[in-house]
Amino acid sequence: MSKQENNEDMITLIDENGNEQLFKELFTFDSDDYGKSYIFIYPAEQENDDSVDIQAYIIADNEDNDGQDLVPIEDDKEWDMVEEVLNTFLDNDGNFKA
């Protein structure tokens, strides 16, 4: 997925079919163990919902070095680490605590 624009915590993702979807950034973090940056996002239309579909991606410079791409996390151990980071920011009811 390519990360098109980042405007005040808002990100437009473009899928392989050219469809755009607006997401809100929850937070980003860096991992020294993996040497990568990560981002948690959720669909903007879910902002006021009781629950949201949080997605996590690796932030990587794109091949043209003119922007960034969001890359799926495919390694199970890496995914466990990312999930653990997210869980430190969720309360017992699954609500985000900043």
From Swiss-Prot:
Q: What are the disulphide bonds in this sequence?
A: none
Q: Where is the signal peptide?
A: none
Superkingdom of this entry's organism?
Bacteria
Q: Name one Pfam family in it.
A: DUF1292
**Matching NCBIfam families, A to Z?**
PRK13678.1-4
Q: Which HAMAP family match?
A: UPF0473
Family listed? Belongs to the UPF0473 family.
UniProt-recorded name of the protein: UPF0473 protein Lreu_0536
